[in-house]
């Protein structure tokens, strides 16, 4: 009787797709309106000046400028966009 014993089925082998969270534009980098600066769950980073906060807590640029990360006395890190100085006309 040349039979093989039935192989057991594994209960593992599943994983969720990564969400690609984190900082997308770092301090000092140039951004234009609409650029995503941080993708996050909750507010690990808080919205500062010239940035918007999406419903999924994504921080994005509202103006052209450079990204600035600042830690305040309350311990929170605020992300802002420092506008570029307009050329004198």
Swiss-Prot record:
The keyword Ribosomal protein applies. Gene3D superfamilies: 2.40.50.100. GO terms for biological process: translation. Residues 1-23 are annotated as: Disordered. InterPro entries: Ribosomal_bL27, Ribosomal_bL27_CS. One of its GO terms (molecular function) is structural constituent of ribosome. One of its GO terms (cellular component) is cytosolic large ribosomal subunit. Keywords: Ribonucleoprotein, Ribosomal protein. The keyword Transmembrane does not apply. Belongs to the bacterial ribosomal protein bL27 family. NCBIfam families: L27. This is Large ribosomal subunit protein bL27.
